[in-house]
Amino acid sequence: MNPLGSYCYRCENELLKFVRNSEFKVHYQFVTFHNLQTVNQYMKNQKLDETDLDLRNEIYTRIYDAALSYKAALLQGKRPGRQFLFELQHQIHHHNRNYNKELLDEILDNIEIDKKMFYEDKASAAVKTAYDRDLQIAQEMNVTHTPSLVIFDNSNQSYGILLDNSITADTISEICNGEPLPKCPEVKRIVEVRSRHNLAKVVNMNR
């Protein structure tokens, strides 16, 4: 997911809606991902000038910085990390805030995250390496743009299902309940996924 993307934010909420209402035991993990294609997609969605190279570079850097911020927050625990992500997205998409250090400081002052440790971690090589590993995992799973959702079922670990764009609670529920895969290009079966255990179960379902 793109931590600054409005469509990703909506799809995350659809996933959480599924988790709340599901009969399955669901483990999920939000993984940040960006490349030139996702930046182009973001600019198009925001109706920005895609020919403005300076703006493109600025947005690329901003998304990367937000991804590192999320990884740094996660180092202080899964719950604080997700709280940071959701508050960041809420401020951007509901209050039209710009992503900058002022917003980060404001968020950090209101959640249970050590600010000094956060900034030290964010600037560290370890966080950058962790993010690069996320990118590698996403690429191995054939993720090319955001939002994307990869679903694994513990009863059949040889493949996962990649859902691009059309991520709704209803669609996820249909897939998890064993209904025929929707006949649309957004749904793909991934055979012999090598990254499954590395990702620590993006989404696992157990009845």
Each PLM stretch: what is its role?
Residues 84, 100-103:
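Short, conserved alpha-helical segments within structured domains
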Residues 7-8, 127:
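Alpha-helix N-cap/loop-to-helix initiation residues
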Residues 9-96:
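Structural alpha/beta surface segment adjacent to cysteine/selenocysteine redox centers
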Residues 1, 15-19, 95, 102-207:
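C-terminal cap of thioredoxin/glutaredoxin-like
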Residues 1-7:
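Short pre-active-site segment immediately N-terminal to redox-active cysteine/selenocysteine motifs
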